Amino acid sequence: DSTSRWAEALREMSGRLEEMPGEEGYPAYLGSRLAQFYERAGRVISLGSEGREGQLSAIGAVSPPGGDISEPVSQATLRIVKVFWGLDANLAYQRHFPAINWLNSYSNYLDDMEPWFNENVKSDWMQVRQNLMSLLTEEASLNEIVKMVGMDALSPQDRLKMEAARSIREDFLHQNSFDEIDTYTSLPKQYDMMKLVYAFYEEGSKALKDGANIEDIVSMQVRERIGRFKYTKESDIAEEYSSVQEALATEIATLTQDKED
């Protein structure tokens, strides 16, 4: 549903009725009308036969002019909803789909969902997710430095963070909707994908402390296998996951051994 077009129609009707306009010509009751729409969503006990429960999700598309979310419709919507997916034109230009900005988007249901993920997927799901989000946040800060002085000015540890964040973006967040396997990914597979990407960062950090060269770490052959893990069939996930983990450990051990020699 296009919330923006609905709000524009509401503004037009309000003007025709000569009602007192609010910010940017929208009626003063814009927020309450939006709340009535979104509050229809939720979990309900249906009428009729006993014991029937149902759920209704409402997803509204807000299209602010020029992408400026400070305008009234966006602000009124954000005050009501608890989940926000911010589409980013720059990601779309880079052919990164889904073009959802991971820094601007959020969900206020994370704390409520944590017990479910712990019970039905893995007990450390939220911790792994937080680790990846921390790397993406640090990448955004480091990008400002890279724009001014270049990648070569970064320390080896910061370069590793940049490479790990790139792996998160390209190997986990990026999705090919035209690929039969990558179109849908189960939660257990998503967990394994996150673990592999973060394992590269963890093992790489240990290798740096042991004296390994950052160029050797970022050019490891196992990174290609990590990137292609998302195209693994569900039936082959466990075997491929173990194989990639072993390959990563072997290459890291080789790098540190060569340094000692």
What residues fall within each predicted segment?
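C-terminal amphipathic alpha-helical interaction region
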Residues: 211-261
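P-loop NTPase catalytic core
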Residues: 2-225
